[in-house]
């Protein structure tokens, strides 16, 4: 059920907010032991919030736009009075005294918090296997990963445990799991959505965005969370347009740039390539013009990212020292010993790896060769995009080089794990909006996603193209039999 359809049923009294909430809580109870999308289910709060909305409707009050919509929140977004762990032992007992801007805006819009979702520890990973509280499974096949780092949020939507969810995207952490789980995932322009209350990973790259089962529902969530926030100095002051009203517009006459570098390289699954090119051809049949585009430094993004992101992470995570809050090692012999042991015992191996990489890249004698050089390449990547957008409206690529991989497949190969974000990272480095839309299935019945990238603040155009593709392709009507999630 789409959010707009649900709102009509709520307003007519056909279905109550409590009934919808109970339906999703029952779904969580039925399937989450297999999926493990949730770290915490806020059943009592969800029912209480739903009851208040039902009372407001019965009293004839105007209902907010997301009234009664059950939403899950990635557990690196602060929720006042509700544990926020970032899936790390370091923050296992942290209960925020304040609300993140995005969650506050959702609650003001009437959304119902149904729970907090699992993620790779501190959002560092591409499979949701580095969580200190156990991995999340892909609802399409529980022997496969859901992607990451927002795998819990993607899996919860895919498994029908909530109507929509929020995640964060630093190098693909919304779009890649959306592709693996067969849902829509949107990373907005950097600064379009406030980061206040998001546990920081890499501050120049992090952005919050929605997961949903449809483009229209993703637009509804973006409408609620976008906009200026004085508590985030990087948040843009640009007015928020009406994202809903663009969905019905045609793609006729738009120029879609097919990024050559994303298709002409080894490592792209032939089934993914064929499905994404078929998506491009469908857009062409709807009146769009396909244009062959080159972004020469697109594939340099991953090396650039794995200098910049760990460098920022090493600075951001320096605050966790066992003194003021977070995990503290017991029986330390000195302050230095307590700090060292707290960080060693509180952080998992992938987080430690990235801190070490970042600290090395920022160290005296190496900062010019690594960090400053990476920033220079980042500028060149931005310029490639600027050149491309001078001649096209939207860029089209696969979201990921492959479909979901088997659980544990990359456990001993960090590089293979990092390469899963090969095609999503450049949009983060350039601060551009990008969206994943399901476009097919591989021979194993696992979803494939197409990525659309827009220019700065061109979310309306992205949503327009994505919606028109989604409506014409009707991919989910072709999903294979035997999938875990026939909701």
Curated annotation (Swiss-Prot):
The protein's UniProt keywords, in alphabetical order, are: ATP-binding, Ligase, Nucleotide-binding, Protein biosynthesis
Keyword flag Cell cycle: no
**Entry EC number(s):** 6.3.5.7
Q: What class of enzyme is it?
A: ligase
Q: Does Phosphoprotein count among this protein's keywords?
A: no
Q: Where is the active site?
A: 74 (charge relay system), 149 (charge relay system), 173 (acyl-ester intermediate)
Record's GO cellular component terms = glutamyl-tRNA(Gln) amidotransferase complex
Q: Which GO terms describe its biological process?
A: translation
InterPro entries to which the protein is assigned, alphabetical: Amidase (IPR000120), Amidase_CS (IPR020556), Amidase_dom (IPR023631), AS_sf (IPR036928), GatA (IPR004412)
What job does the chain carry out? Allows the formation of correctly charged Gln-tRNA(Gln) through the transamidation of misacylated Glu-tRNA(Gln) in organisms which lack glutaminyl-tRNA synthetase. The reaction takes place in the presence of glutamine and ATP through an activated gamma-phospho-Glu-tRNA(Gln).
Q: How does it assemble?
A: Heterotrimer of A, B and C subunits.
> What protein name does the entry list?
Glutamyl-tRNA(Gln) amidotransferase subunit A
**Species this protein is from:** Synechococcus sp. (strain CC9311)
List the gene name.
gatA
